[in-house]
Amino acid sequence: MADIDNKEQSELDQDLEDVEEVEEEETGEETKIKARQLTVQMMQNPQILAALQERLDGLVDTPTGYIESLPKVVKRRVNALKNLQVKCAQIEAKFYEEVHDLERKYAVLYQPLFDKRFEIINAIYEPTEEECEWKPDEEDEVSEELKEKAKIEDEKKDEEKEDPKGIPEFWLTVFKNDLLSDMVQEHDEPILKHLKDIKVKFSDAGQPMSFILEFHFEPNEYFTNEVLTKTYRMRSEPDDSDPFSFDGPEIMGCTGCQIDWKKGKNVTLKTIKKKQKHKGRGTVRTVTKTVSKTSFFNFFAPPEVPENGDLDDDXEAILAADFEIGHFLRERIIPRSVLYFTGEAIEDDDDDYDEEGEEADEEGEEEGDEENDPDYDPKKDQNPAECKQQ
């Protein structure tokens, strides 16, 4: 028994010696290593662990435990800072209201350009040679001889086939080239070939913030509407119950429109036949039932929000996606439609993701090189005294 006590005393003396060594003035790698040793020894000490656990128990379920422990006079000052933050949110809300006013102002300046785009797409206006001149990127430039040869070949091809009017299937191609392609089903495509234009209209000055998406169609065999609309209601003010969550204007709700489908042309519905067997008599009958069908045109019939504002999970997910699509159409598709028609906008988006991927790959390669290095010691990269500040 005495031998065991002597052994424990010897180990304790050794631990104390190690601690004293760490306290000596040292520099470089030895200091880091011994600091880690000291940390390990402290975490193995039952008394230290007990004190730490007691401290943590006092903070259970209280993410702001430090705040709660502050003196009352300091808490009062923190409350003053919160009131300042609310005023900041109110100023920010005014800022976004003025941004909306600027959008309305500049929409008037954009409109003549969008009108001419509409006329070119729909063969109302034929652009001049000067308007059709486009200087390609440097990497796409070719010699004048090749240009002339290509021009002659194009002219021959044009002579061989009927001259198309405007830019056929412009908006359908825009949708098929983008993430909206998931919304467009095969049975939607013949209808979207008749889509002539998409416009965005902002609410008038002094009116509640909102915008309307207008889809203009030429006469077709599917419905009688000339224009289908989707209205989005917005809010740009902090919520009184949660003012710190304000992060700019948000879409609060949306309203679609009724589509006046011609008989048998409603692509949002389908008829299914079910066979039902009578339990008692064993007879079988066929029942016809109309059910909803996946279609782009369901976009104009969003879920209705009850007066109490409660929606089931499916309806909430649909509305959240709907808001994203409405915002995307307004901010990207309508102002930059030609780039989505050609696919250049998609390439730009892909380039952004590729750059991120390349950076990640490079980081991965560097990590791999270190791990394959026989002299690499991962412990040397660890420094418990450092942490990242966000």
From Swiss-Prot:
Q: Where is this region: Disordered?
A: 1-32, 131-163, 345-390
**One BP annotation, GO:** Schwann cell proliferation
Cysteine methyl ester-modified residues are C387
- The N-acetylalanine modification is found at A2
Modification after translation: Polyglycylated by TTLL10 on glutamate residues, resulting in polyglycine chains on the gamma-carboxyl group. Both polyglutamylation and polyglycylation modifications can coexist on the same protein on adjacent residues, and lowering polyglycylation levels increases polyglutamylation, and reciprocally. Polyglutamylated by TTLL4 on glutamate residues, resulting in polyglutamate chains on the gamma-carboxyl group. Both polyglutamylation and polyglycylation modifications can coexist on the same protein on adjacent residues, and lowering polyglycylation levels increases polyglutamylation, and reciprocally.
Name any GO cellular component annotation: melanosome
* Signal peptide (residue range): none
Query: Could you tell me which cysteines form disulfide bridges?
Result: none
> Which sequence positions carry the modification called Phosphoserine?
S10, S69, S143
Localization per record:
Nucleus; Melanosome; Cytoplasm
Recorded GO MF terms: chromatin binding; histone binding; histone chaperone activity; kinase binding
The answer to whether the entry has keyword rRNA processing is no
Q: Write down the InterPro entries for this protein, in alphabetical order.
A: NAP-like_sf (IPR037231), NAP_family (IPR002164)
Which positions carry N6-acetyllysine? K116
Task: Check the record and name the PANTHER family matching this protein.
Answer: TESTIS-SPECIFIC Y-ENCODED PROTEIN
**Can you quote the domain comment?**
The NAP1L motif is required for the histone chaperone activity.
Family listed: Belongs to the nucleosome assembly protein (NAP) family.
- Protein name per its UniProtKB record: Nucleosome assembly protein 1-like 1
